[in-house]
Amino acid sequence: GMDVQKQEIREAVELPLTHFDLYRQIGIDPPRGVLLYGPPGTGKTMLAKAVAHHTTAAFIRVVGSEFVQKYLGEGPRMVRDVFRLAKENAPAIIFIDEVDSIATARFDAHTGADREVQRILMELLNQMDGFDQTVNVKVIMATNRADTLDPALLRPGRLDRKIECPAPDRRQKRLVFQVCTAKMNLSDEVDLEDYVSRPDKISAADIRAICQEAGLQAVRKNRYVVMPKDFEKGYKSSVRKPGDEFSFY
């Protein structure tokens, strides 16, 4: 699945690292950065890892919250260190997951913690501006909340390509079910197409949870075969209906 997303991230990250001369001959600059956004569990992190696997580039993965440190100035210094490390080991890919934790739209900060987070964002903007296109370093960022990001980060020249990772369609759900159940011992009565055709909006992570829960139901009953009733229980326990709400005590 995700054929369009794979093609777009390949053009933005993989091809500039492996065939940079192609862009030079055409007379264009490859995208500097890529933003992956979409609901949780739709494969944003796995897509970035797949790109790193298909290139010989060094892969540096950082979670946005890791930049937020106890002492003043530590966060911006870590941002500089990450980009310096990438340049020293070029070609390299910097993957910043959950970037919304440090790159939300700026506002009048009233606390020291908020001001420090904004300094981290300023350093991130500065580092992405100072990129030399001849240095093969690409930046991939992922978030569930693209609507909260600072406009200065989203402008062309920093994050040139925005790739949406939506919930899987029917064909993609079928493929994910096939992958998740490939090693499972399923009964002949299990009809995966029934779960694929259901209208509930589920992510790839939900599908994996359904299959895991179905397997656990079989283990609980001390069976070696997963039955249709196991999948039904797994589906009901893993998929939330639109009206469902968690109870808070």
Regions inferred by a protein language model and the residue ranges of each:
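C-terminal engagement/docking regions of AAA+ P-loop ATPases
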Residues: 3-4, 26, 191-212, 217-249
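Walker A/P-loop NTP-binding motif of AAA+ ATPase domains
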Residues: 1-198, 202, 214
